[in-house]
């Protein structure tokens, strides 16, 4: 991918400085073994010795695999499930399918439980799991068995910002030096889009559309609203409006009763993140949504699942979407 760094090494001291602010995932620590081909990093499970230059990485969460390609460190095998994009039917997510095929990445079987046998068959020298979703739960439950196969790093599920997730993955594979150029690409595009749009006036409520009939809104500090706020799109504080509602353990969705939707989502604008649920057009036929101010006025937009929990590529694509949705008419 153009502009991606392929530089290999960063000193352990610089690595610690770069990643020291990443909450919950730790940063690389000089374990004195790098000359012997290993290094020690800090994880939620404690200090962990990992390869200094891993060659056969297996990724257990499709939501984390995209970072590996962004870091120019394609895994030998990966789970391919990404919420709202791919599921048990298999197939690589479109965002990195071409890179996965070019690298010869194998697909791990998807199921209700993690296939330890398939992971072992890939002969990994490093395993990366965790993150969010069912695959994160599976990896956590199987951690001890996975650790018998190869050093296993679980990205904390509390890391919902794509920047923090990418830092955690980069730390694990010793590619922290590849992160700053990617972040600069993002900042450059952010400034480009910000200068070319007119954000909607007033607050914007973010609605998550998942499979099933339950009603969800997205907290203002989750990944998608946080990205929008960088562009001047002000999110509604839905948590404050529904203090008794159930916040997901990952912190990026809030389940509310349909009766509360009119109160919680009472904003002049709305953005619907379609993560495998009803489309915007279908929601418009639902009286609970149709009565919202944003739906009545037409100030409602739809973004795909890749924007709900974006990785690096998803964040870049979402910036483009915001640029299209809110393009300045005088520019």
Would you name each region that the model predicts?
Residues 56-68, 178-243:
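Basic- and aromatic-lined ligand-binding clefts that recognize polyanionic substrates
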Residues 47, 143-213, 316-331:
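Extracytoplasmic substrate-binding proteins
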Residues 1-14:
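Bacterial N-terminal signal peptides that target proteins for export
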Residues 25-29:
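Bacterial signal peptide processing site
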Residues 116, 123-129, 261, 266-267:
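Proline-aspartate-enriched helix->loop->beta-strand connector
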Residues 171, 264-331:
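Structured C-terminal subdomain patch of bacterial secreted/periplasmic proteins
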Residues 65-115, 126, 131-132:
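A short, structured surface patch at a secondary-structure boundary
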